[in-house]
């Protein structure tokens, strides 16, 4: 049989990167399969076809009976079994060597002087080896190792079933054959049937032990990962996980995590304007002047405290001064301009310009708006009518009128 040294060296390298049960499995494969098969099985099955004899002189009958009794030699069958069962382990070893080589290249690139700045955000993969220098069985390597065990188990089961259907688990000394070109049923005899039966049972037991080790290794890996998941600390509460807990699903309402404060709702209010109280205690909303006074109907009696025409002129003058208030405030903000000549009032008398002390501006502390309060007085009557001027002077004295409006 061929040399097993090359396969043995490969499997020895794979043993360094296996679990404890995997190392036991490889030991069983080395000692109880490869060594026993190379040392003893060839000696037992070396004279298999030469010592297979049949009680006939028909040419070719003995060969066809041997082919029917042993479709494939036991030794070659076990060699194929060893190769197929070892192939998943060799694939796993290739994956390990690939990862180790990639890590070595990465270290070489890190030792080289940096060249042009590459794209940022590149994260280096996790190191393949741990602190003790052993290869970590995790991630993609763990998946490869699990598939390695699964395929080894399937190959073991397949070869055990194939051996049973081809030969059975026992060789009988007598084999009856009626295959053409034998003239009739002939008796054929197998050499050393008891010794061969012992070898068959031994190799079957080794295959069952390997199958049991594969099952235990799968259980060991599953229990180990489950234990790590139970004993590992909880993941930190990241902003992404917090945002994912509030994300609506399928248009359903937001689901807040337990023990969380209700979301804050901001309600907007219109700006608050402080009312400006006049000297008579009356209040009016700033920025909303009263409508102009209605026109006096003929025959309507005048307001008390003065003639009817005098009251109408005073109210009209108040309204005109209110309309001119925005212009007055804009002139205060601009540089002083020459004072225009006094305009005539509707009553025929010159209208005096408002003194600076007559208008005061009061602004809100928050800067929301400015309110200007203006006190307006009726102009004096011409001296032609002494009775009317006395009444006007009495009504337009230093005190405020009832019809005046503070803005």
UniProtKB/Swiss-Prot annotation:
Subcellular compartments: Cell membrane; Cell junction, Gap junction
Post-translational changes noted in the entry: Phosphorylated on multiple threonine and serine residues. Phosphorylation may have a role in assembling connexins into connexons and gap junctional plaques, as well as channel gating.
Keywords: Cell junction, Cell membrane, Disulfide bond, Gap junction, Membrane, Phosphoprotein, Transmembrane, Transmembrane helix
Annotated intramembrane regions: 2-15
UniProt topology in membrane: Multi-pass membrane protein
Tissue expression: Only detected in the lens.
SMART domains: CNX (SM00037), Connexin_CCC (SM01089)
Composition skew (Low complexity), residue ranges: 356-370, 387-399
Gene3D superfamilies: Gap junction channel protein cysteine-rich domain
Molecular function terms from GO: gap junction channel activity; gap junction hemi-channel activity
Disulfide-bond pairs as recorded: 54-188, 61-182, 65-177
Extracellular side: 41-71, 170-197
Cellular component GO terms, alphabetical: connexin complex; plasma membrane
Residue ranges, annotated region (Disordered): 108-130, 233-257, 279-407
GO biological process: cell-cell signaling; gap junction-mediated intercellular transport; visual perception
Residues annotated as transmembrane: 20-40, 72-92, 149-169, 198-218
Compositionally biased tracts (Basic and acidic residues): 121-130
Sequence ranges on the Cytoplasmic membrane side: 16-19, 93-148, 219-407
Subunit structure: A hemichannel or connexon is composed of a hexamer of connexins. A functional gap junction is formed by the apposition of two hemichannels. Forms heteromeric channels with GJA8.
Physiological role: Structural component of lens fiber gap junctions. Gap junctions are dodecameric channels that connect the cytoplasm of adjoining cells. They are formed by the docking of two hexameric hemichannels, one from each cell membrane. Small molecules and ions diffuse from one cell to a neighboring cell via the central pore.
Family: Belongs to the connexin family. Alpha-type (group II) subfamily.
PANTHER family: CONNEXIN, GAP JUNCTION ALPHA-3 PROTEIN
Protein name per the record: Gap junction alpha-3 protein
Natural source organism: Bos taurus
UniProt gene name: GJA3
């Amino acid at each position: 049989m061929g040399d097993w040294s090359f396969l043995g060296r490969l499997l020895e390298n794979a043993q360094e990167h296996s679990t404890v049960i995997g190392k036991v499995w490889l030991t069983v494969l080395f000692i109880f399969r490869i060594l026993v098969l190379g040392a003893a099985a060839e000696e037992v099955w070396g004279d298999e076809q030469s010592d297979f004899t049949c009680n006939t002189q028909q040419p070719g009958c003995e060969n066809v009976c041997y082919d029917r009794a042993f479709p494939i030699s036991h030794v070659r069958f076990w060699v194929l079994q060893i190769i197929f069962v070892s192939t998943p382990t060799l694939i796993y070893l290739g994956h390990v060597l690939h990862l180790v080589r990639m890590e070595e290249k990465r270290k070489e690139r890190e030792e080289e002087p940096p060249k042009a700045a590459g794209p940022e955000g590149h994260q280096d993969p996790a190191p393949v080896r741990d602190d003790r220098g052993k290869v970590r069985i995790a991630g993609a390597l763990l998946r490869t190792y699990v598939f390695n065990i699964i395929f080894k188990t399937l190959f073991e089961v397949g070869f055990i079933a194939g051996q049973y259907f081809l030969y059975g688990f026992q060789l009988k000394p007598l084999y009856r054959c009626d295959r053409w070109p034998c003239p009739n049923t002939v008796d054929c005899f197998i050499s050393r049937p008891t010794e061969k039966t012992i070898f068959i049972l031994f190799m079957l037991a080794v295959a069952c032990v390997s199958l049991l080790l594969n099952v235990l290794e799968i259980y060991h890996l599953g229990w180990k990962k489950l234990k790590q998941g139970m004993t590992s600390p909880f993941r930190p509460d990241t902003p992404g996980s917090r945002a994912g807990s509030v994300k609506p699903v399928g248009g359903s309402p937001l689901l807040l995590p337990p023990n969380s404060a209700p979301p804050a709702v901001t309600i907007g209010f219109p700006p608050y304007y402080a009312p400006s109280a006049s000297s008579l205690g009356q209040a009016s909303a700033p920025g909303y002047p009263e409508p102009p006074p209605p026109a006096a109907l003929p025959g309507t009696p005048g307001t008390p405290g003065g003639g009817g025409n005098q009251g109408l002129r005073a109210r009209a003058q108040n309204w005109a001064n209110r309309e001119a208030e925005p212009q007055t405030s804009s002139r205060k903000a601009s540089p002083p301009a020459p004072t225009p000549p006094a305009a005539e009032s509707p009553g025929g008398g010159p209208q005096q310009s408002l003194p600076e002390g007559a208008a005061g501006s009061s602004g809100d502390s928050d800067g929301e708006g400015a309110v200007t309060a203006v006190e307006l007085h009726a102009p004096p009557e011409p001296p032609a009518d002494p009775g009317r001027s006395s009444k006007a002077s009495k009504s337009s004295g230093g005190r405020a009128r009832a019809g005046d409006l503070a803005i």
